[in-house]
Amino acid sequence: MSTLVVMASVFALAGGGALLLRRRLEEILPLSVVLIVGVQYAFGLFGWLSAGFYAVLALCALSLALLAVRLLRGGLGDLRRFLLTPGAAVMLAAFVWALLSFRAHMLYEPDEFSHWGTVLRNMMHFDAIPAGVKEANITYTDYPPATTLFAYFWTRLSGGFNEGDPQRAMNIMILAFLLPAMRAQRWKRWGSALCMACALFVLPTLFNSGAY
């Protein structure tokens, strides 16, 4: 269920931004992830990480309202041009894949125990960026917190720590930053769009054999 809620939040944020900036959804998705991370980080610097989480939810609600208003004014033309794109379909497929693939996932890699899983649990426990908490049990305090902040948003929406959520968040975040490559794809050239989509899923494995 958390995956569906995160998907709705990310798509609402990206959809509102796409119609506001008159850009295709796949071009705005990376900005949506950056906004989710950036807002939480800004609040987290002052020790208000929960407030940052709720601020992001407020932005999602505001973006959803903007999306509805813009669609009422622009009609189905804007919907087809900016939102119902091949890139949006790829992102939707990625969320479905993340939902199904990590249902029984458990942390087992050494770096998951030494950092990725541990830092998220500390972030949830202290409700703060762990690098600034003396009592936090983390090894690498100098790691940038962006990935963990996106996983924190995901985990907060799920209502509790789930070992599959950090992997879901990380992989969705990676794909979101690759997705602008889909901006030139069109439904009438579905073969080209399919090849590009497959390439985007394969690309992370070229640099990390443990991807996915």
Where are these regions (language model features)?
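Membrane-interface catalytic loops of GT-C/OST-like multi-pass glycosylation enzymes that act
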Residues: 45-55, 107-110, 207-212
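Specific aromatic-rich, kink-prone transmembrane helix
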Residues: 10, 14-16, 197-201, 205
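Internal/C-terminal transmembrane anchor helices
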Residues: 82-102
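Low-complexity, intrinsically disordered, cysteine-poor segments enriched in small/polar
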Residues: 71-85, 149, 156
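Active-site lumenal/periplasmic loops and adjacent helix-entry segments of GT-C-fold
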Residues: 99-192, 196, 208-210
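Hydrophobic alpha-helical transmembrane segments
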Residues: 4, 30, 89, 193-194
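Membrane-embedded, hydrophobic transmembrane alpha-helices
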Residues: 1-80
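Transmembrane alpha-helix segments characteristic
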Residues: 37, 93, 190-202
